[in-house]
Design a protein with these regions (language model features):
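Glycine-enriched, solvent-exposed interface loops adjoining structured elements
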Residues: 1-204
Length: 204
C-alpha cells in the first residue's frame, strides 16, 4: 500500500491534491488492494519470461495420446507457462500456442514433419472437460519424462496481506497499480503517465 502511495505522491504536481481530507485512508487502501491483483496479472502476463520467477512447478504425471503426443493437467491457479521440457527434447519451450491458431492446427497434420518434434517442440494450453491441460508435441516415444515444468500462478493476496510478485516485475506492478487507482479518482493524465512508466520496467 505504502509503495503505491509513494509512487503517486512522487509523480503528482504541486497543484494535484489527490487524497484530500475527505478521502478516507481506509478507502484509499481498499482501492489499492482491489487494483493490485489486476496490475500484477497484467504485468506478469505481458513481461518477457526472463523477468519472471519460476518457483511454481507443474505436476510431472504425463498422459500419453499416441505418436509421442501427451499432456499434463494444469493446476487451477495456472496463469502462464515459464518453461517446459521433456527428457528427449533438444530445447525448452517457453511460450505456448493458442487453440485456434494455425500452428495448433498443424499439430493434427498427418505428416510428422509438420508437427512439433524433439528438435522443435510445441506446447499449447487447452481447455478440456477435466480442466486446463498443457498439450505437448512431441516425443520420440512414451519413455520420455518431464525434466522441467514451471509456471506463474494467478496473483492473489494471502492472509497476511502479501502478494507474490516476481522481483523484476515489482516496480512495474507498483506503478500500474497507482495508475489504476488514479483512474478511479478521475486523474486520467497522471494515470496514463504512470501506466507508461510501468511499461518501461518490463518492455525491455
Amino acid at each position: 500500500m505504502r509503495d503505491v502511495r509513494v509512487a503517486i505522491d512522487h509523480n503528482a504536481t504541486n497543484n494535484q491534491l489527490l487524497f484530500d481530507k475527505d478521502t478516507d485512508t481506509l478507502t484509499v487502501d481498499e482501492i489499492i488492494r482491489s487494483k493490485i491483483i489486476d496490475a500484477a496479472r497484467i504485468v506478469e502476463m505481458s513481461a518477457p519470461t526472463r523477468l519472471l520467477e519460476s518457483s511454481y512447478n507443474l505436476e510431472d504425471s504425463v498422459f500419453w495420446e499416441g505418436q509421442g503426443r501427451g499432456y499434463v493437467v494444469l493446476p487451477d491457479d495456472f496463469m502462464r507457462l515459464i518453461a517446459f521440457r521433456m527428457s528427449d527434447w533438444e530445447r525448452t519451450v517457453f511460450t505456448t500456442i493458442e487453440a485456434g491458431s494455425v500452428e495448433y492446427a498443424k499439430q493434427s497434420s498427418r505428416y510428422k514433419g509438420i508437427r512439433g518434434n524433439p528438435q522443435k517442440p510445441v506446447c499449447a494450453v487447452i481447455n478440456r472437460p477435466i480442466g486446463k491441460v498443457l498439450e505437448f508435441y512431441a516425443c520420440k516415444n512414451e519413455d520420455a519424462e518431464v525434466t522441467q515444468a514451471s509456471y506463474r500462478p494467478y496473483p492473489q493476496i494471502d492472509p497476511n496481506d502479501g502478494i507474490d510478485i516476481s522481483e523484476q516485475c515489482y516496480m512495474a506492478t507498483i506503478y500500474l497499480t497507482a495508475s489504476l487507482v488514479l483512474h478511479t479518482f478521475g486523474e486520467k493524465d497522471l494515470a496514463i503517465t504512470l501506466s507508461e512508466l510501468a511499461k518501461s520496467f518490463y518492455q525491455i
